[in-house]
Amino acid sequence: RYEGITTAEIRAQVPGWSVWSHGCPDGESCPEVEQRCRRVIALAQSLVASQAEVGAVALVAHGHILRSLAGSWLGLGPAGGALFNLNTATLSVLGHERERRTVVRWNARMTPAP
C-alpha cells in the first residue's frame, strides 16, 4: 500500500510513521518479521554447527531485513534494526565474544584489491 510514495507522504496520513514502529499495511506484521528473523538465525547457526570447517554463513538481502536480523541477533527484536545505519554494497559481520552475541563489523565498505 505504501509502494511508490515517500516517507513524507505517508507521514502526512500517519503522523510519526516509521517502518520500525508502524509497519506497512498489507505487509508482514512485526511478530511475523520477528519469527522470520528467528528462523533465519536458527538456520544459520545450524549450518555453522554442521559445517564446523566452514564456520560462517553469508546472507544477502535487502537493507531493512538485514537491519532487523542484526536487532534480533542482539536480542533487541527486529525494531532494534532502526539503530543500525546500513549502506548499499557493504559488509556486516555478526558473531560472538565468548557466548555473547556481538556485531563484529558493520556497514564496512568493500574496496577492490590494488
Language-model segments: residues:
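Generic beta-sheet signal
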Residues: 53-64
